[in-house]
Amino acid sequence: MFHDLPGVK
């Protein structure tokens, strides 16, 4: 998926 958001991991 997308991992550009802050704190997505």
Swiss-Prot record:
Protein name: Protein YhgP
Induction: Expressed at high levels equally in exponential and stationary phase in rich medium (at protein level). More protein is seen when cells are grown in bortezomib, an inhibitor of the ClpP protease (at protein level).
Further details from the record: This gene overlaps yhgO on the same strand in another reading frame.
